[in-house]
Amino acid sequence: EVTPIYGAVGFESRYVDFLSPKWMEMLNYTSSTAAKLGMGMDMNTGTGWPFGGPQIKTADAATKLIVQTYKLNAGEIVKEAIRVNDPKQQGIAVLQALVAYDEKGNATDLMSKVDAAGNLNMQPVTSKTEVYAAFSGKTLQKVKRAAPGGEGFTLDHLSKSATDAYLARFT
């Protein structure tokens, strides 16, 4: 099995970037030598853990749920714009759901009341209410112990487009 991982310290001048022409030449040599010896050969399509790399852009990177809660008393509204608080997620995370729950557990979907700037056009609540904002954010995790040339974001393993983007470099 050929599994490309991080390079050995002290041998940086001998690193060969993953899937570069030189790397492919070396893989070809390994494969043909194995065949001559009557051996099979397998190659892992990952470098390090988990799968990802330079071809994975932010849109296809591993995703996570971010939940923010706004607690309101009777007569109040959410005054601030509904935006993700984490500075690392600003400009990345996308609001997916906005739901208010009153004291009795009744739910009200507020998504249609949020404008493009995140301003919420709502009436004051009549009882204690909790508003939950659910954002689709990114883990921003990078491939750990990536082979030279394999560094980059971890892919969203549940996304067809991310998987297609990842596998495209092998076709």
Regions found by a protein language model. Name each.
Residues 1-24:
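Aromatic-lined carbohydrate-binding/catalytic grooves of carbohydrate-active enzymes
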Residues 17-171:
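Mature extracytoplasmic enzyme cores
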